[in-house]
Amino acid sequence: MKGLYQVTAMRAKKIISEEVYGNIAEKDTLFNRLMTRHKIPHARRHEWKLQEVKLNKEIND
């Protein structure tokens, strides 16, 4: 299901969250878009863990 998702990730005690567009079946893509928006380099992304993916708005194509 495509739409706008609120994606949250955590590293140690730091939490980042952002609304990103994507498909719920592709959680890796949603996670990567979150990391890109917060300018987290690829070498440091393994430190972050996906916490929550919540649908904000469904978009039908």
Q: What residue spans do the PLM features occupy?
A:
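Short aromatic-glycine-(Arg/Gly/Cys) micro-motifs in beta-strand/loop hairpins
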Residues: 1-15
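A short, exposed loop/beta-hairpin motif centered on an aromatic-Gly-Thr core
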Residues: 14-26
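Residue-level detector of intrinsically disordered, flexible termini
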Residues: 8-11, 24, 42
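Short, mixed-charge low-complexity intrinsically disordered segments
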Residues: 32-61
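Ordered hydrophobic segments in well-structured contexts
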Residues: 4-8, 20-22, 49
